[in-house]
Structures are given as C-alpha cells and as structure tokens.
C-alpha cells in the first residue's frame, strides 16, 4: 500500500478484500478491455534481521517466501504502468494474501472480487527455480497440480510390547498401509497421466516397549486431471480402510481439499508467450522445456 501511495492520483486503491487483499485499478484512454494482473504473498515464520526500512513489523514473521517475490514484481509493474501508461483500457492489479494454507484467493472471491472488478482475462506468474534466470516459461492447459491433504487416524488397542497378543497394533496397520499406498499411482493411474501420493508423516507411540493405541498418517495427493484426482482419492480411502480392517483397527479419514488443478487457457497463454518473445527474445522463452511436463511440485 505504501508503495502504491505515491500513485494514488492514478490508481484507485481498494483494501480489505478477503480481509487483507488489496486491489489497484488504473484506467487509460477509452478502451473497453479490462485485464487483471494477479500476484500473491506468503509470510514465513522467520525472524527478520535485515534492518531494512520495509522489515516486518511482526516478530517472528518475514515476507521471505518465493511468493512474496511475486508481489514485489507486481509492485514494479504498477510503478512502470503508472509512469508510462502504455495501454488503453482498464488494468486491475490484484494483490492476494495467503497463497498457501489459508486460501487467500478463495477469501477474495467470496468477498466479491470478480463482481466488483470484472476482468476479460487474468494473468499471473510463478517463479520457477528449475528455469535459468532470465528465462520465461509458458504452458497451455494443466500447469500446476491439484492438492488434497489427508489426516488418517488408525485406532487399535494399546498394550505392553511383551504381550502383543493382547493388543491391536495400529503401527503395524499404518506401516502396511504406507507400503500399499505406493501401488495407487503405479497400478491404477494411466502411465500417460501424472499423480503423486506422498505419506509425509507417520506418528505413533513414545516408548520402545509399548504398543500404542493409535497411529496417525498425514498424506498429500496431487494430480493434473480432475478424474485422476477422484480416482486417486477413492483408491487411497479404500486401501487405508481395508488395510486397517485387516489388522483389526478402525480408520478415520479427514480430507482437506486444498487447490484444484491450475489450467491455463490456450488463447491467453499464447498471447503471453508472444509478449515474452517480444520483450526477452525467443531464445529466453522456454516454452518447449516447460511444456514437456506440467508442474506437480506445489506447496
């Protein structure tokens, strides 16, 4: 907001959209087109010790995430557009909070973002560590994977490690489920389509000689197609429930849908690619390399 302040005579600034989102609107000429440029941000739990004038005002929180670089880039674009005004129509600059976790985009949409600021097309960009510095990448169609998070609790009967016959071991059931889940993509998903099932945590017990009462698994699922996503979700649920039952345990599954597949429209993607070629040169546009494989590494 403070960066846009010097240009308030040019930008109409709107704050508090989706709680902390900011939108800047800039008009030029008589054009009727309305294009949106969107950037996001995500603070990290880091103590900022840079001493810079724009350092975080909140202890233990720093805008050091890669997504915060997106906001810095859009602020740079705002200053350039306000200074040069080389366009005809309306530009809507969307500064979205909470790219991950809290779902800032959903909050802004629920707050009437697109009803208040309708756009003919929306453009955004994401830094890509896999691309060489100075290069741009474009891909029409599925670009970034959906993400679903699962928290699984397996309930058994705890007991002493010397008397396993009097217990129902949820850790054994959880271990078996982890191994069985490796078959979901390998034996259920079309090899020409992409999906990932990751068990990122298995938590159970505290003592070497005690069989725990419960075990907890935390999973993330990713897919680049809606049908594949549903297929993976169904098989994961089925495997967990049946593996738990086979060891005499009860399974409860909490599902947290995070994000759908990001799908880039063909026409707008090609338009952006052509602009990239004009600005940076064809040799700097990595359309072929990026186009070979969509991105499943997300958040």
Which residues are covered by each model-predicted region?
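DPxDG-like acidic metal-binding loop motif
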Residues: 71-78
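Short, well-structured beta-strand/strand-turn elements
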Residues: 12-17
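Short, small-residue-biased leader/transition segments that mark boundaries at the very start
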Residues: 3-10
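Histidine/acidic-residue-rich, glycine-tolerant segments that coordinate divalent metal ions
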Residues: 22-23, 43-62, 68-69, 81, ...
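Metal-dependent amide/peptide-bond hydrolase catalytic core
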Residues: 175-299
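Short beta-strand-to-loop junctions in surface cap/lid or active-site-entrance loops
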Residues: 24-31
């Amino acid at each position: 907001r403070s960066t846009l302040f010097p240009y308030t005579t040019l930008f109409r600034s709107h704050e508090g959209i989706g709680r902390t989102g900011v939108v800047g609107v800039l008009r030029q000429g008589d054009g009727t087109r309305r294009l949106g440029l969107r950037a996001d941000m995500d603070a990290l739990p880091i103590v900022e010790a840079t001493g810079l004038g724009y350092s975080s005002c909140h202890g233990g929180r720093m805008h050091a995430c890669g997504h915060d670089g997106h906001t810095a880039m859009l602020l740079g674009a705002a200053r350039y557009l306000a200074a040069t005004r080389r366009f005809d129509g309306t530009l809507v600059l969307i500064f979205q909070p909470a790219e991950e976790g809290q779902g800032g985009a959903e909050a802004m949409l629920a707050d009437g973002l697109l009803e208040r600021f309708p756009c003919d097309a929306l453009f955004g960009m994401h830094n890509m560590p896999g691309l060489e510095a100075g290069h741009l990448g474009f891909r029409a169609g599925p670009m970034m994977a959906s993400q679903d998070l699962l928290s699984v609790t397996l309930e058994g009967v705890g007991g002493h490690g010397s008397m396993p016959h009097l217990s129902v071991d949820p850790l054994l059931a959880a271990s078996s489920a982890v191994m069985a889940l490796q078959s979901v993509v390998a034996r259920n998903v079309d090899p020409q389509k992409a999906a990932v099932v990751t068990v990122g945590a298995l938590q159970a017990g505290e003592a070497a000689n005690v069989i725990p009462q419960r075990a907890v698994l935390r999973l993330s699922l990713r897919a680049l197609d809606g049908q594949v996503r549903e297929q993976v979700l169904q098989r994961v649920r089925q495997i967990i429930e049946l593996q738990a039952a086979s060891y005499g345990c009860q399974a409860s599954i909490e599902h947290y849908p995070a994000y759908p597949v990001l799908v880039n429209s063909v026409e707008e993607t090609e338009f952006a690619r052509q602009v990239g070629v004009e600005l940076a040169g064809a040799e700097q546009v990595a359309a072929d390399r990026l186009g070979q494989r969509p991105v499943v590494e997300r958040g």
